[in-house]
Amino acid sequence: MTVPATRQDLMIVNMGPHHPSMHGVLRLIVTLDGEDVIDCEPILGYLHRGMEKIAENRTIIQYLPYVTRWDYLATMFTEAITVNGPEQLGNIQIPKRASYIRVIMLELSRIASHLLWLGPFMADIGAQTPFFYIFRERELIYDLFEAATGMRMMHNYFRIGGVAADLPYGWIDKCLDFCDYFLTGIVEYEKLITQNPIFLERVERVGIISGEEAINWGLSGPMLRASGIEWDLRKVDNYECYNEFDWEVQWQKEGDSLARYLVRISEMKESIKIIQQALEGIPGGPYENLEVRRFDKVKDSEWNDFEYRFISKKPSPTFELAKQELYVRVEAPKGELGIFLIGDNSVFPWRWKIRPPGFINLQILPQLVKRMKLADIMTILGSIDIIMGEVDR
């Protein structure tokens, strides 16, 4: 009897690009020795749209609709960073009510983002049921967004100096009801997932990152906090009014895929705590800084010339960005979302550099999957939580 010869050479496999509802248009070139991963090369750029260059010939108000297309599952954060930069450049004060509204919207957006991470992550490792469950709660959040902003996604709600509109009548009660309901939903997820032996088999001791490695690779967000580093920009930078609320930074020390799952589940609970405190303590007053309406517009601007008057309505009130540079950052669901902004006394930014958390967190993927099994790639990639819109920009 002849024994079939076994192949000794390595196999190269293309994984992706995937459907946008899962991991987006990310392509991985994986080198395999049987089931073992020898090498992995991510290929990016399929969703590159030149977002940084577009910013250089748009005013901030004109650019706001573009930024919601970076991380299209947590659009409030991209809007927040876009208005925070010019606010700091122009030293524009935010009314207290507007700051509270912003915090509420940001934390709701964080929960929605974590929910839509949880569903596909569980589907990746073989649990289909949570994928359908998460849409119940996420739909309620989108109903709240729609009532306040008019849009379920791509809200275009933040403005320099405040927000576009005040909260509608009855919205606060509706949001408090959601918070009470959502806490029971998280308990259901934890019962279903956290102690499940098949789930634990797939995620424990898979994709381990030490605290030192996480810092050296520049990781942020749940990737960093799951490796034992208590670093959250909401505590570090005290932007908006986070220092007025009672909440804790959520972290784990194991550094594996399970730790990253636990950090995100705990973060959703903390977000609910912040939202409840903000809703109960929200002050009255204006929802935007009315001084911002009277920005110093350029005298005799070409926009006021005769030939421009009949093209469309005049552009929104805007102001010159001072000739200086600035780095602003917020704690987005995926990590540190930053903008490096250079003004040059023009209504357009001279440079608008985006620091997306997903792009930097993704750099460690080839190191994490080496010497792992092929099936573990989806577990590790899912635990990183990437959105290709912000990775490719």
Curated annotation (Swiss-Prot):
It is a peripheral membrane protein. Disulfide bonds: none annotated. Its main location: plastid. It is an enzyme of class 7 (translocase). One of its GO terms (cellular component) is chloroplast thylakoid membrane. It catalyses: a plastoquinone + NADH + (n+1) H(+)(in) = a plastoquinol + NAD(+) + n H(+)(out); a plastoquinone + NADPH + (n+1) H(+)(in) = a plastoquinol + NADP(+) + n H(+)(out). Its EC number is 7.1.1.-. It is found in: Plastid, Chloroplast thylakoid membrane. One of its GO terms (molecular function) is NAD binding. InterPro entries: NADH_Q_OxRdtase_suD, NADH_UbQ_OxRdtase_49kDa_CS, NDH1_su_D/H, NiFe-Hase_large. One of its GO terms (biological process) is photosynthesis, light reaction. Keywords: Chloroplast, Membrane, NAD, NADP, Plastid, Plastoquinone, Quinone, Thylakoid, Translocase, Transport. NDH is composed of at least 16 different subunits, 5 of which are encoded in the nucleus. Belongs to the complex I 49 kDa subunit family. NDH shuttles electrons from NAD(P)H:plastoquinone, via FMN and iron-sulfur (Fe-S) centers, to quinones in the photosynthetic chain and possibly in a chloroplast respiratory chain. The immediate electron acceptor for the enzyme in this species is believed to be plastoquinone. Couples the redox reaction to proton translocation, and thus conserves the redox energy in a proton gradient. This is NAD(P)H-quinone oxidoreductase subunit H, chloroplastic. It comes from Acorus calamus var. americanus. The gene is ndhH.
